[in-house]
Amino acid sequence: MQNYVIYKIPINPKNTAENGDSMETQNMPRNVVEHFSIQGKVVNIERIKKGYINSTYKVETLSENNHIHKYILQRINTNVFPDVDALMSNFRLTTEYLSHHLLMPGSHKRGTVQMIRPTKDGKLYLKDDSGAWRMMTYFDNVYSLDIPNSPKVFYYAGLAFGRFMKVMRGVDVTKIKEVIPNFHNTKSRYLDLEDAIAKDPVNRVAEVTAEIAFVRSHTDLFGKISEALESGKIPTRVCHNDCNLNNILFDEETHLPVAIIDMDTVMPSSPLYDYGDSMRIGTNTATDDEKDLSKVSCDLGLYEMYARGYLESCGDILTKEELELLPYASLVITSEDGIRFLMDHINGDTYYRIDYPGQNLDRSRTQLKLLDDMEKKLPEIRKILQKIYDEQGLDANVL
């Protein structure tokens, strides 16, 4: 089960702040909650330290019949998502559609989706001096995982994200807005890195010359998916774009997936990025900031389990061209994250939250080592996928 760091915010706070938060920070969520259309009176607010981007809180209220209601309150990071209207439009369209069509492996009914709770005046979010806030439904009796605790779990993760991909065919891609331009355009990310190297704003380039050289030796990889999209060789689809294992909620009793969360990056893209991102995280034998790079490798057993689940769910909707690019998907997205972490380190750690100096560099080195291992194992990855294609009757040849 994922370990959350939770800070309790008192409803009647003392004069001194706790847990390093200022009084203003502690009072902020409490003052925001009253603007949303929810049941009961607030009895508890807890800050959930999870994720790199938004600030998240668990809100508990008590109704007149002594029933406890739970919600998720988030302050949206407007540096990452400057167009909040577009973000929330995508969120509503996606969740409303999924609420009628998505059936998860661990659910007996369609529509187990994190829904928006509007403000009292009917808006999708609240904008005030402290930022942009939204309220969402909360799931009880579930847990999430940062890494798979068994091959079977990763198989079910593949099933879940594959079902999401297949169901989202029903959403008109032209109605989904691009809230982060070039989010998974690896070639564009590389050009951004070169720009950061040229500017060297905090004088860190000299310490990362080996990493820069490794990235530059892989430029032929970066455009494999984005160029296929741009040329129309593969279709643009509505994708999740953040298929981390911890964006799946598992039932505490059955241990099956019951919901997919974090729809902020749902945008026009390619399922190759979604598939590759899941593999990047789930097959890594080390943590994402592991200093001992000898521990970093791609677990091919886990790779096969996820591939089986994913293709079982949505392989029949993927084109021959998509299937033939699938072996490269994990390599492309792993290189992309290595680039992004390296760029943030060079820029002075302005995007990702860090817990210690140099963490973004550790993250980058881990991704680049994982890329190196995936590259060496590419022949085995091809064999795994071809075996699954043949078993499932998918028309593609990757050998």
Report residues per predicted region:
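Active-site activation/catalytic loop segments of kinase-like enzymes and analogous catalytic loops
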Residues: 272-316, 332-351
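Short, Lys/Arg-enriched N-terminal segments with co-localized hydrophobic residues
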Residues: 7-22
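ATP/Mg2+ or Mg2+-diphosphate-binding catalytic cores
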Residues: 336-399
